[in-house]
């Protein structure tokens, strides 16, 4: 049965307008994004099929162009639309820490870092640069790929910190696996960065690992 023949309060779009987006299931939200189904399937049916194929909403949102576009009902145009939506969401959440804002809430800082890094399908290493009053100067993604001692260069981190005239910074990187537990490599590169930055009187306040949850090196006593 076409969605247009469903009772009004069961149609995803009408349900969202009357009850809010939080009332919708993952399949219903995805169906609104898809707009149409395929032969023999409504948009909701197709959404359920895609969620099953990818293993849930998050893996679908993290899929690369090739795997995303190979699924029936999707393609490069939908992939581009999805990336635009995700980036708008990241930017919206990022506004919680604008330039000049002081870091008064660890929770706000972590939400910001999660918004920026959580959904990347590859590892990204970033720095949040702060002034001597712990106000935000800039956020930069510096390295992509496998985060280890060979790919994160302390000299470049120091160079960018000095360019921003930063007095302190927060390191962050994501684990695409969703497991936020720091590795020994994470601990080693954190020590190298801390020591390199200390030579120019710049403090490392924390290193946050972003996965399905967040791990703070400062809270663990790993700094």
From Swiss-Prot:
SUPFAM superfamilies according to UniProt: JAB1/MPN domain, RuvA domain 2-like
PROSITE patterns: MPN, UPF0758
Protein name: UPF0758 protein Tgr7_0100
Organism, as annotated: Thioalkalivibrio sulfidiphilus (strain HL-EbGR7)
One Gene Ontology term of the molecular function aspect: metal ion binding
Database matches in NCBIfam families: PRK00024.1, radc
Superkingdom to which the source organism belongs: Bacteria
Pfam families: RadC (PF04002), UPF0758_N (PF20582)
Record-annotated MPN domain positions: 102-223
Keyword match Metal-binding: yes
InterPro entries cross-referenced by the UniProt entry: MPN, RadC_JAB, RuvA_2-like, UPF0758, UPF0758_CS, UPF0758_N
A GO BP annotation: proteolysis
Motif JAMM motif positions after renumbering to this chain: 173-186
UniProt keywords, alphabetically: Hydrolase, Metal-binding, Metalloprotease, Protease, Zinc
Keyword Isomerase: no
Protein family (similarity comment): Belongs to the UPF0758 family.
Residues that, per the record, bind Zn(2+): 173, 175, 186
